[in-house]
Amino acid sequence: MAKNYPVVSAEYQEAVEKARQKLRALIAEKSCAPLMLRLAWHSAGTFDVSSKTGGPFGTMKTPAELSHAANAGLDIAVRMLEPIKEEIPTISYADFYQLAGVVAVEVSGGPAVPFHPGREDKPAPPPEGRLPDATKGSDHLRQVFGAQMGLSDQDIVALSGGHTLGRCHKERSGFEGPWTRNPLQFDNSYFTELLSGDKEGLLQLPSDKALLSDPAFRPLVEKYAADEKAFFEDYKEAHLKLSELGFADA
């Protein structure tokens, strides 16, 4: 979709760059890239194409949205970011949370996802139940990412590769463990591990395995496992799209 980005002031652009530097330092020091990426994704992934509600507009800071079951643990991310936000009040929460996701990928060795500022904070959080359910298969993934958010099959598989970062926590999701050997390194190992089958100590969710059994998803898994550069290019595009759902639509 064509975008018509708002023009922001020089002062605002400076605030964005200052926030970027502070985020780099925080994420490197606290090893919290996976948490920040999850915050950005869960903020944006509530967008609904048909009603034009939800999306990356800063509502994650509200107790109502933080209380959604899919967001268990994200209150930690919101608390960690608040001192930086207080220091840089010019930047919107909407931009700040999406910038945190972009910086998380970059600090972990992933691609440089483009960032366009100008999202405005919205007051009302989206209803619960719009984020993907890890226990379900490819039809569910297409319903949430495709029909609801307006993303493609390629976007679904590329974004799944973001699970190269982080781990599941039983008290948050009911699942336990990392997807890859180095959960702080952004690379294509999610796909190589997925293709090599179950291994002790590593996690494969039903929604991960769905990528192997689906005839449209599997070739993309194989492509990204064989070619990290191709994965980075497609991931960058998918992350950008996700971070701008409902923002600056021309």
Swiss-Prot record:
InterPro entries: Ccp1-like (IPR044831), Haem_peroxidase (IPR002016), Haem_peroxidase_sf (IPR010255), Peroxidase_I (IPR002207), Peroxidases_AS (IPR019794), Peroxidases_heam-ligand_BS (IPR019793). Pfam families: peroxidase. Binds 1 heme b (iron(II)-protoporphyrin IX) group. Its main location: cytoplasm. Its cofactor is heme b. One of its GO terms (biological process) is hydrogen peroxide catabolic process. CDD domains: ascorbate_peroxidase. The active site is at residue 42. Expressed in roots, aerial vegetative parts and reproductive organs. Expressed in roots, leaves, stems and flowers. Keywords: Calcium, Cytoplasm, Heme, Hydrogen peroxide, Iron, Metal-binding, Oxidoreductase, Peroxidase, Potassium, Stress response. It catalyses: L-ascorbate + H2O2 = L-dehydroascorbate + 2 H2O. Binds one cation per subunit; probably K(+), but might also be Ca(2+). This is L-ascorbate peroxidase 1, cytosolic. It comes from Oryza sativa subsp. japonica (Rice).
